[in-house]
Amino acid sequence: MPSLKDLKNRIASVKATQKITKAMKMVAAAKLRRAQEAAEAARPYSQRMNTVLANIAKAVTDADGAPVLMTGTGKDQVHLLVVCTAERGLCGGFNSQIARFARDHVRKLVAEGKTVKIFTVGKKGYDILRREFASLIVERKELREVKKIGFENADQIGKRIIEMFEAGEFDVCTLFYSEFKSVISQVPTAQQLIPAKAPEAVAEDADHAGAVYEYEPDPAAILDDLIPRNISVQIFRALLENVAGEMGAKMSAMDNATRNAGEMINKLTLSYNRQRQAQITKELIEIISGAEAL
């Protein structure tokens, strides 16, 4: 049984931890609002980019001038998985959820006889995936020093992916991230980047259905510029979704930790009071017994 001094020290230690988790919860809550606004603002732009890309792509489908980023290599053997996670932990199962989703995809592809390569964005994803797939990780990117995610960060990743594709290092590229739904809900998501999604997969706006477009210069030339930018835009959106999801998960995790610390403090305090009461009672009995002996 721990002594009164040990219990007192443990209570003080848990109270100090509770102060830290409560402060971290408040910081995460403040960051969450800004991150959520940024993620929600990026969604319409990225979705519209996909729609525009699909509409232009219709004009060059099966044409000789279609960009290779849209048509692909014609093969489906080598897959590059770009797995985006957070740089830090203390956010519940946020990182492990994305990594587990990507890991299941890797196992499925390997079972089908495909060659898999992994590009990790974020330290935690790398730390988790290297335990099982160290030999498959061909590229890693950490954003630990980046205070605020900007488009230039996503653009660097996008350009590196395109460089790898043009060098013939893979046939298909899929982006993995966590889509922010709410503080308690972040959904692991997979999005194919290369080849660009088939035009029919993105519906044209109902108001413009059947409209005839004229492109200047030709559609293929526009796609040559648009597809690389769209890849960076989709990565940027994924990074923003991840930040919002991370802050939501962190706020929830720190709230749980704060409440658990409170429960532990109550239990330790109760144990301390009982032991102290028993000790006082014992001392009183000893005093009374001594007095009677006299």
From Swiss-Prot:
Signal peptide: none annotated. It is found in: Cell inner membrane. CDD domains: F1-ATPase_gamma (cd12151). Pfam families: ATP-synt. GO terms for biological process: proton motive force-driven plasma membrane ATP synthesis. GO terms for molecular function: ATP binding; proton-transporting ATP synthase activity, rotational mechanism. Its main location: membrane. It is a peripheral membrane protein. InterPro entries: ATP_synth_F1_ATPase_gsu (IPR035968), ATP_synth_F1_gsu (IPR000131), ATP_synth_F1_gsu_CS (IPR023632). Keywords: ATP synthesis, Cell inner membrane, Cell membrane, CF(1), Hydrogen ion transport, Ion transport, Membrane, Transport. The keyword Transmembrane does not apply. Produces ATP from ADP in the presence of a proton gradient across the membrane. The gamma chain is believed to be important in regulating ATPase activity and the flow of protons through the CF(0) complex. PANTHER family: ATP SYNTHASE GAMMA CHAIN, ATP SYNTHASE SUBUNIT GAMMA, MITOCHONDRIAL. Belongs to the ATPase gamma chain family. This is ATP synthase gamma chain. The gene is atpG.
